[in-house]
Every structure is written in C-alpha cells, then in structure tokens.
A protein has these predicted regions:
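Conserved beta-loop-beta element that borders a ligand/cofactor-binding pocket
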Residues: 1-17
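Active-site loop immediately N-terminal to the catalytic Tyr-X3-Lys motif
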Residues: 9, 21-22, 67
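Short secondary-structure boundary micro-motifs
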Residues: 14, 22-23, 98
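Residues that scaffold the ATP/ADP-binding catalytic core of kinase and kinase-like folds
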Residues: 17-18, 124
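Conserved catalytic-core motifs of eukaryotic protein kinase domains, centered on the activation segment
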Residues: 18-21, 43-44
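C-terminal substrate-binding subdomain of Rossmann-fold SDR/epimerase-dehydratase oxidoreductases
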Residues: 26, 32-170
Length: 170
C-alpha cells in the first residue's frame, strides 16, 4: 500500500521495564512485593518463549535497517519456560514464599505452548537475543522495585480513572 517498503516482525512474549502489570511477569512481581496471592492458571505447565524488550527493539531496528522488503521475521528469545517455573523464579529472586502461589482455573482455549521459530532472522540478519533470561528477569525485578509509583498507580485504579476521563463517552 502506498509503495512503502514493508517488512513484518512477529515476536514471542516480551518482558522488561514498563510491562503492563496485568501480564504474567509484572503481575507476579507486583503481587509478590505486596504479599498477595500469585494466581497461576491450571497447573502452570503452559509454556511461553520470553524475549527481553531491549532485544526485541534491537531486532526491530535491524529489520528496519537490513531486512528485506515484504519479508516476515519471527523474533524469539530462546527462553521457553513453563509459567510455574517463571513464577517460582520470581519468588526466589524476591525472597518470598512459594506459599503465595495459588492455582486457579485455567482459561478456556488457553494455549499450552506459545513460541515461534526465529531461525530466519538468525540466518538472514545474524540477530540473536543478547539478554540471558536470568539477567533479564533480574533487571525487570529491579525496575519494578525502583518504579513502584508507576505500577502502583495503575493497579490502584488511578490509571482506569484517567482512561475513563480521557476516553469515556467519546
């Protein structure tokens, strides 16, 4: 359309700073910091591939600069992990008890595995994620520890009130 040089990027689950607190990793961090239950769907055996947000940004930049027009690039983190293992890792990093983990009824149609094959971007553009999951999760936890006001305003309802004021009844 409009003769624009378009490439497509598809990615696995991102994590890192500013990750909205409704998602698995930030939700578990915020709840653990507040000693609230850590709700895990089903038995927690659903698998996700995790990609640190800065690695995803680097991949997008590389695709924009060096990608071929009309190509599709899958950007994956090589970090396939079960949700329960992610939650236990967060609990460990925060020095909290696994007793906070609460198993809840799984969502209908919940994907058992969500991951993509990033072989093409590795082969064609030489991209590989630079952040090891263990390092990325620690940076993410540190960010949430140092930016409580940001995420606490969101989970307190202040964000929802702002959103309704700005966009409600329009």
């Amino acid at each position: 359309t409009y003769k624009l040089p378009i490439s497509i990027s598809r990615c696995s689950n991102n994590y890192g700073p500013y990750h909205f607190p409704e998602k698995l990793i930030p939700l578990m961090i915020a709840n653990a910091l507040n000693d609230k239950p850590l709700p895990v769907y089903g038995e927690g055996i659903n698998v996700r591939d995790w990609l640190y947000v800065e690695d995803h940004c680097a991949a997008i930049d590389l695709i924009i600069r060096n990608g071929k027009e009309a190509e599709v690039y899958n950007v994956g983190g090589h970090n396939e992990m079960r949700n329960i293992d992610i939650v236990k890792l967060i609990v460990k990093h925060l020095g909290k008890s696994e007793d906070l983990i609460t198993f809840v009824t799984d969502r209908a149609g919940h994907d058992m595995r969500y991951a993509i094959d990033p072989t093409k971007i590795h082969h064609d553009l030489g991209w590989l994620p630079q952040t090891k999951f263990e390092d990325g999760i620690q940076k993410t936890i540190d960010w949430y520890l140092n930016n409580r006001e940001w995420w606490e305003n969101i989970i307190s309802g202040e964000y929802q009130q702002y959103y309704e004021k700005m966009y409600g009844n329009r």
